[in-house]
A protein has these predicted regions:
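Transmembrane-helix signature of polytopic, membrane-embedded enzymes
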Residues: 10-14, 91-95, 115-143, 162, ...
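Catalytic lumenal/periplasmic loop and adjoining terminal transmembrane helix
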Residues: 24-25, 29, 75, 255-258, ...
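Extracytosolic helix-loop segments that constitute the early lumenal/periplasmic catalytic or substrate-binding loops
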Residues: 25, 37-74, 81-93, 274-283
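Transmembrane-lumen/periplasm boundary regions of multi-pass, lipid-linked membrane glycan transferases
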Residues: 47-49, 68-77, 198, 210, ...
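Transmembrane-helix motifs of polytopic, lipid-linked glycan transferases
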Residues: 103-128, 166, 170, 321-322, ...
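Short helix- or helix-capping micro-motifs
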Residues: 137-142, 149, 169, 196, ...
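Hydrophobic/aromatic-rich transmembrane helices and adjacent perimembrane loops
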Residues: 157-163, 199-204, 208, 299-313, ...
Length: 526
């Protein structure tokens, strides 16, 4: 039976290919979220800046002198050439020109997620040396609804998470080869330097990965009983190569810093206290990003992580002696654990602004998965494989049921609490496409306007460009009736508009709960 399963799972990469095809297709069916237009606008500004520098153009790029210049261009360096290819292969219907540009980035985000799955598997395999376990747990990770949902549209956090995981694998391989006296080619250090710089170009908080590098380095030094100076002497050239490539490409990926390198310091300071006026509904409280309780990360982790992962974390302390009797776990599991704890501790101590559930620490979720799954493997491989298989089936069912709102998934503890009132819902605005489709199918009365807080997302999918769209701030002004009100994202909490009737509602049911979770509403006001 075991050999049969192993032979079947030798087709993992065939599965990954079809997974990529299906996921890429589905990503094009997801609405346009609020971050996408802004990110693309910043990229356009950076392109204009490059044209100003190299071709003596005179475009206005003054916005890059503000905090907008703190965003790198890494994602778009990759997405732009792929986009050109997709334009010739994919024909997206019922979307305007600008919307088409934004939607074509969705499958590219999904590519990053698939790459993260490849390196997730590599890390699990490094620790367990068990192909069957590595394949199954990677499928578990790839079908996890919360991250899968984000991989359909999240142009910032998913690429960042994926590249972090790639760099984690690279630092493990490089250190392992160095300390085991295996020749490491210079291109490995150059690659790590480039990808570390690329990580910063996705999010300036990528600088945190040096904490992970340092922790791994300390564990390897200690385990091999090598003094720092004895390590430094034969490896100083390689360290210099890494740092040089890192610094060079960090500046290359940030055109707005070319004339003033010290802006990097401003970027680190600004992004650590990123201004966010919205609050995140957490257990019924609207927690403000600037004044979060220390429990914020732990509450969302408790409800977002799968039960199998929570169980692995729960039994970790009881298996500590067994786990760290193995050298592999000391060199891999221990540093990964220290990395997660250190970063979370620093975020809490420095009161870093966090919002929108776990998006700022999403890059830690694959590492938390790896930690928990390694613990479970050491606890009982057989039981873990059975439970993992069950969760994969359950996740597939949930993904089909929730699409395109997969990212809103909560674990089964949701049956003990009313999600609609106690947690943030469609805060990204994925429902824009479905709402637009509803408006398209149900012809609006002549000259009737639509008032919404997400006009920028809805407009791309409207068949008629003549539909009157008004900002949400116009709701309490004198408007010609009839008119329509679309409430989504955080505006859902503002109550029912006066003299308006609910005519459509987007909602989901999570897991086994029968609770209807409202995501968007359309009202007709007469």
């Amino acid at each position: 039976m075991k050999n049969f399963l192993q032979n079947r799972l030798n087709t993992f990469y065939i599965f990954l290919f079809f997974y990529f095809i299906v996921g890429s297709y589905l990503s094009l069916s997801v609405g346009i979220t609020h971050d996408e237009a802004h990110s693309n606008w910043v990229w356009e500004l950076n392109k204009k800046k490059l044209l100003n520098i190299f071709f003596n153009k005179e475009y206005d790029v003054s916005y890059l002198e503000t905090y907008h210049g703190f965003y790198g261009i890494g994602f778009y360096l990759v997405s732009t050439p792929i986009e050109i290819l997709y334009k010739n292969l994919v024909n997206i219907k019922n979307v305007d020109f600008e919307g088409n540009i934004l939607l074509l980035k969705h499958p590219i985000v999904f590519i990053f997620f698939v790459i993260s799955g490849i390196f997730f598997r590599k890390i699990i395999l490094l620790v367990t040396k068990d192909k069957l376990f590595s394949d199954l747990t990677t499928i578990l990770y790839l079908t996890y609804p919360y991250i899968l949902g984000h991989s359909f549209f999240n142009v910032k956090d998913i690429p960042f998470m994926s590249v972090w995981l790639v760099n984690t694998f690279l630092i493990i391989k490089i250190l392992d080869d160095i300390f085991n006296k295996i020749l490491v080619k210079k291109k490995a250090f150059i690659t790590l330097g480039i990808l570390t710089a690329y990580l910063l170009s996705l999010r300036i908080s990528g600088i945190l990965i040096f904490i992970e590098y340092l922790i791994f380095f300390i564990f390897y030094l200690n385990n091999f009983n090598i003094k720092f100076l004895n390590f430094l002497k034969p490896n100083i050239k390689n360290i210099f190569i890494f740092l040089t490539s890192f610094i060079f490409f960090s500046f290359l990926f940030y055109p707005s810093f070319w004339l003033d390198p010290f802006k990097f310091l401003d970027a680190f300071k600004f992004m650590s206290q990123h201004i966010q006026t919205a609050c995140t509904v957490t257990l019924g409280d609207c927690m403000k990003a600037q004044n979060l309780p220390t429990s914020y990360i732990f509450i969302w982790s408790f409800f977002k992580l799968p039960l199998i992962i929570l169980f692995g974390l729960l039994i970790f302390p009881f298996l500590e002696k067994k786990l760290f009797s193995l050298k592999t776990n000391i060199l891999l599991l221990a540093p990964l654990t220290c990395t997660v704890l250190s970063i979370i501790f620093l975020l809490i101590i420095f009161n870093v602004n966090l919002y929108d559930e776990l998006r700022q620490i999403m890059f830690l979720i694959p590492i938390i998965f790896i930690i928990s799954l390694i613990v479970l493997y050491n606890y009982s491989k057989k039981i873990t494989l059975i439970i993992t298989s069950f969760f994969i089936i359950f996740f597939i069912y949930q993904n089909i049921k929730l699409f395109p709102y997969n990212y809103l998934w909560l674990n089964n503890f949701n049956i003990f609490i009313q999600v609609d009132k106690n947690f943030e819902k469609d805060y990204w605005g994925v429902s824009t496409k479905k709402i637009a489709n509803y408006l398209n199918k149900n012809n609006l009365e002549n000259n009737a306007c639509v008032i919404s807080n997400r006009n920028e997302g809805i407009k791309h999918f409207l068949k008629s460009s003549n539909i009157c769209l008004k900002p949400f701030s116009d709701l309490h002004k004198k408007n010609n009736r009839p008119f329509y009100v679309v409430m989504m994202e955080r505006s859902l909490n503002k109550g029912t508009p006066i003299n308006c009737t609910l005519i459509h509602e987007e909602s989901i049911k999570i897991n086994l709960s029968q609770e209807k979770v409202s995501l968007a509403k359309v009202y007709k006001c007469i």
